[in-house]
Amino acid sequence: MAYRLSLIIITLWVGALWMSGISAYVLFDTLQDKQMAGMLAGKLFSIVSYIGLGSAFYLLIHRVLQYGTAALKQGFFWAVLVMLLLVLAGHFGIQPILESLKSQALPADVMKSVFADRFKSWHGIANVAYVFECLLALVLVLKAR
């Protein structure tokens, strides 16, 4: 039963990661109001972060309980751990910086403010981390057993 639950959790986490990335693209491509698109995408990514936190903790604990210290020799374990670190860095590190830059720019749009360059830099870092997390998610799918 725990094995099947871990497969369901992997499916939920990986699906949410990939779907949020696709949804963010569609939001920015479709909506003329880029601030609204950013707000909606941010909410999606926040939800996915919490899914990731819960999923990672379950998968890591399950792996250690199932394999003991041998779990530390598995690519699956390390992929989940790195994904967890990326979620933590993104949600509790990078996102607050982006939010701070947006609020400092008010009432102007951050992209039309003196904070635009810093925002673009941090947003780029967040994008690279997210893509890396999505690639590691592929490792989870391939290594799940």
What are these regions (language model features)?
Residues Y67-L81, R145:
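Cytoplasmic juxtamembrane regions at transmembrane-helix boundaries
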Residues W13-V14, W78-G93:
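Hydrophobic alpha-helical membrane-insertion segments
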Residues M1-L72, S100, L106-A116, K120:
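Interfacial loop at the N-terminal end of multi-pass membrane proteins
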Residues L59-Y67, Y130-R145:
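Transmembrane alpha-helical segments in integral membrane proteins
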Residues I47-S49, G124-V131:
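Membrane-interface loop-to-helix entry segments
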Residues I22-S23, A89, G93-P96, V139:
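Transmembrane alpha-helix boundary/anchor motif
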Residues Q32, Q66, I94-Q95, A144:
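Short helix-capping/hinge motifs at transmembrane helix termini and TM-loop junctions
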